[in-house]
UniProtKB/Swiss-Prot annotation:
Keywords: Activation of host NF-kappa-B by virus, Activator, Apoptosis, Host cytoplasm, Host G2/M cell cycle arrest by virus, Host mitochondrion, Host nucleus, Host-virus interaction, Modulation of host cell cycle by virus, Transcription, Transcription regulation. One of its GO terms (cellular component) is host cell mitochondrion. May form homodimer. May interact with host CEBPA, CFLAR, CREB1, DDB1, E4F1, HBXIP, HSPD1/HSP60, NFKBIA, POLR2E and SMAD4. Interacts with host SMC5-SMC6 complex and induces its degradation. Interacts with host TRPC4AP; leading to prevent ubiquitination of TRPC4AP. Interacts with host PLSCR1; this interaction promotes ubiquitination and degradation of HBx and impairs HBx-mediated cell proliferation. It is found in: Host cytoplasm; Host nucleus; Host mitochondrion. Pfam families: X. The lineage of its organism: Viruses, Riboviria, Pararnavirae, Artverviricota, Revtraviricetes. This is Protein X. GO terms for biological process: DNA-templated transcription; symbiont-mediated activation of host NF-kappaB cascade; symbiont-mediated arrest of host cell cycle during G2/M transition; viral genome replication.
Length: 154
């Protein structure tokens, strides 16, 4: 079983939001490089937030009806895809954090829609899930592969 999420660009805040499909909530904005850091309050994620639905590599807040509170996962092994062949994405996000010219938010949105979610949802490649923490989520991972390299912008 896979958690189904979709991303939606909020151009007024330059934030890419991840939201659960069919959820009533508006979701949580991404942290760090794509917008202002938004620390979840203790009530933002209910105590029964779907840990029983755990999927390798996803933090427990990914299953909250409020949506995940920071971008932290990708189905691309070691962040490498046809679009991102040499670990370019972490460098791009780091440049954006520093306010330097980098990939536009529209390009980032296309990357996640076309590469990450296509591999994850359509191909169902759960085994390849890797976790990259890009901001201040307080939630622990359900499972993190020992070979996973973490990139943090915060």
């Amino acid at each position: 079983m896979a958690a189904r999420l979709y991303c939606q660009l909020d151009s007024s805040r330059d934030v890419l939001c991840l939201r659960p499909v069919g959820a009533e909530s508006r979701g949580r904005p991404l942290a760090g490089p794509l917008g202002a850091l938004s620390s979840p309050s203790p009530s933002a994620v209910p105590s029964d937030h779907g840990a029983h639905l755990s999927l390798r590599g996803l933090p427990v807040c990914a299953f909250s009806s409020a949506g995940p509170c920071a971008l932290r996962f990708t189905s691309a092994r070691c962040m490498e895809t046809t679009v991102n062949a040499h670990q370019i994405l972490p460098k791009v996000l780091h440049k954006r954090t520093l306010g330097l010219p980098a990939m536009s938010t529209t390009d980032l949105e296309a990357y996640f829609k076309d590469c990450v979610f296509k591999d994850w949802e359509e191909l169902g490649e759960e085994i390849r899930l890797k976790v990259f923490v890009l901001g201040g989520c307080r939630h622990k991972l359900v499972f993190a592969p020992s070979s996973c390299n973490f990139f943090t912008s915060a």
